[in-house]
Amino acid sequence: MNRFLIALAMSCVLVAPATSQTPKGELKAGAIAHTTESRPLVVSQALVGIPSSLTRGAVYVGPLNAMPATLAPGKVPLVVFLHGSSGLGLKAIGEWQHWLATLGIATIAPDSFALKDRLTYSSPVDKDTYEKVHAMRASEIDIVLEAVRAIPWIDTSRMVLAGTSEGAVPVARYRGDAFIGRIIFSWSCEDNYFVHSHATAIPDNQPTLNIISSTDPYFSRSNSWLGASPAALGHCGEQLKGNKKASVVLVPGAPHTVLMFDQAKAPVEGFLRGLFGI
């Protein structure tokens, strides 16, 4: 693996967790597997970013089912992005998609909340519940792949799989071959409170970028209820150490969402330009 890219010209020191009682999370029971009704909505309600080269005007960021009816001829590379537990309402997601569209890169972020009465939670909850959520999120990769293969303006030979937080777990676990690279935001690829086992399945020859705060409130040692071994790093370095095409970026002192931090955007741009040849 490439030596860690540090966002500042100084070493990042992971903060040791303070001793405290594990807080009680909240769980709102509900549906936890997509249905014949929700599957098409996962895609039609997806948030897409479309470059101006296709719109013949301004970049489009909005629902797939409201995108411009006519696009210019041509194909563009695509990033499939899996949102976190808060859904597509997170402002940074649309901003990130708009930014990538200005680089000539299309994005599609499937809507996990297309499932009526979907289960929701605030951490921590039990691992069995988390794993059911992870399985549902993994199914969304196949749902969106089936759809994008029928979209004429997507170059399916140039696709990257990305996700943040809850959405990053299925990115790390994905075992298919539809994507030429992966971007894992705000997930550490380690055993902790969020999984029974991290089950990372990234081939050692697949380009991969992991970006996370050095003090991530959920997956670094800053979290007093992390539930990880004392050797936990708070990033995917251990799982990527055999991958010479992987990099880990730590953003010092950042919050959980790092999508639009300059220290995250620069490596993402370089990573995608290199993979997509743009």
Placement of each model-derived feature along the sequence:
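Alpha/beta-hydrolase active-site loop
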Residues: 127-152
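Short amphipathic alpha-helix adjacent to the substrate-entry channel of hydrolases
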Residues: 91-108
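The feature captures the conserved acid-bearing segment of alpha/beta-hydrolase catalytic domains
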Residues: 181-249, 256
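C-terminal catalytic histidine-bearing segment of alpha/beta-hydrolase fold enzymes
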Residues: 241-278
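Short beta-strand element of the alpha/beta-hydrolase
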Residues: 74-84
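Cap/lid segment of the alpha/beta-hydrolase catalytic domain
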Residues: 86, 112-135
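Primarily recognizes the serine-hydrolase "nucleophile elbow" in alpha/beta-hydrolase
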Residues: 144-203
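N-terminal cap/lid segment of alpha/beta-hydrolase-fold proteins
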Residues: 21-74
